[in-house]
Amino acid sequence: MLKSFRGGVHPDDSKKYTANKPIEIAPIPDKVFIPVRQHIGAPTSPVVQKGDEVKKGQLIAKSDAFVSANIYASTSGKVVDIGDYPHPGFGKCQAIVIEKDGKDEWVEGIPTSRNWKELSVKEMLGIIREAGIVGMGGATFPVHVKLAPPPDKKVDVFILNGAECEPYLTADYRSMLENSDKVVAGVQIIMKILNVEKAFVGIEDNKPKAIEAMKKAFEGTKVQVVGLPTKYPQGAEKMLINVLTGREVPSGGLPADVGAVVQNVGTCIAISDAVERGIPLIQRVTTISGGAIKEPKNILVRIGTTFKDAIDFCGGFKEEPVKIISGGPMMGFAQSNLDIPIMKGSSGILGLTKNDVNDGKESSCIRCGRCLKACPMHLNPSMLSILGQKDLYQEAKEEYNLLDCVECGSCVYTCPAKRKIVQYIRYLKSENRAAGEREKAKAAKAKEKKEKEEVLK
């Protein structure tokens, strides 16, 4: 048995609702609402206009920035609006609304057929960048950036994250069972790009069928499939790297600092589709689950489908949910309405009942220390939450390693005072980012002033 990481928690995995449900293809809704911001990095700008006819797989928004990701039409039809619409992370965001024409026709040239073994690393990275692929476990970092580490970072191991440790979510689990050929191709493509010979597939040991399926799929390769102790957040990058390689990502560091790159199952499938068939990222497997959902399912759904349309495909609600979550219950975000769209990083939609939710009235920290024991990053969550209440982001960053927090929610799960620790930490991070932007603007203004003074001399 592998040694586990320090900290973590053991919530009920609640995967019984959908673990044995094969992936179903969701119908294409009458309209898709495709946000231009679905990734970490520079936002994209529309390259289509209201009234344009578009095909499935056609580029509709792009950015010339390196850290960004193209956006594509998820079906064919007419662009009926470009404006601000509900967004799961930003409240409202510019989105391109496409009314389907019922034909679902591909843009010319897609799909195609390519042998990845005959492509150069540069060609494959270009294809992945063009296809708009991001990390599909929720982080949504552009994959072409992650697969091109700086020359001074010597990567020697790739890790496929098959842990899927968030309760309720089974999209990756079903994908490993049903699309193992694409998973294998995606891993092999990544290994060629990174020029590594060592790779691991890490899967929690509460998924024996997935472990068996992956061992069979990777038989005869240099990829090692490993059953991991079931403990949340086993699927966090830094935890996976530590358990599988013994390496510890330093404070403020990245996986590449210790020679590792991690991607999840859905991302590998998207890479296979793009490199082998030329298909951009226009759909994904998403879990629709929770006690309020009438027929929980794993669905292959088009980007831009609203939560309402996805839930309706699952029979709607059997009772009024007390909470709707985008993602999983530990790291996901509560939503106030069902008009928001499924995006590239939408791993799940949860409709939770009162019995599903461990909510309660928040009170002051009682200094019990449970959150410190649960934190896998060796932080002091209680102090960070207190600093969040006091708006002391600088102190949180410099003295309590704010930016090392992975927002896993283990602290919240263990807190008897029901403190919203992760919310405070997210607030501190947002304030820190805002301060950084203010400093950049101040420096730019000072530089401009100095240049003007030089001209006038």
Curated annotation (Swiss-Prot):
Induction conditions: Up-regulated when grown on H(2)-CO(2).
Keywords: 4Fe-4S, Cell membrane, Electron transport, Iron, Iron-sulfur, Membrane, Metal-binding, NAD, Repeat, Translocase, Transport
Required cofactor(s): [4Fe-4S] cluster
Keyword Electron transport: yes
Subunit structure, interactors included: The complex is composed of six subunits: RnfA, RnfB, RnfC, RnfD, RnfE and RnfG.
Free-text function comment from the UniProt entry: Part of a membrane-bound complex that couples electron transfer with translocation of ions across the membrane. Couples electron transfer from reduced ferredoxin to NAD(+) with translocation of H(+) out of the cell. Essential for energy conservation during autotrophic growth. Contributes to ATP synthesis during heterotrophic growth.
UniProt subcellular location: Cell membrane
Region named Disordered: 433-457
4Fe-4S ferredoxin-type domain segment(s): 353-386, 396-427
Family: Belongs to the 4Fe4S bacterial-type ferredoxin family. RnfC subfamily.
One of the protein's GO biological processes: electron transport chain
One Pfam family, short name: Complex1_51K
Primary location recorded for the protein, binned into one broad class: membrane
Binding-site residues for [4Fe-4S] cluster 2, renumbered to this chain: 375, 405, 408, 411
GO cellular component annotations of the record: plasma membrane
Stated name of the protein: Proton-translocating ferredoxin:NAD(+) oxidoreductase complex subunit C
Cofactor note: Binds 2 [4Fe-4S] clusters per subunit.
Binding site for [4Fe-4S] cluster 1: 365, 368, 371, 415
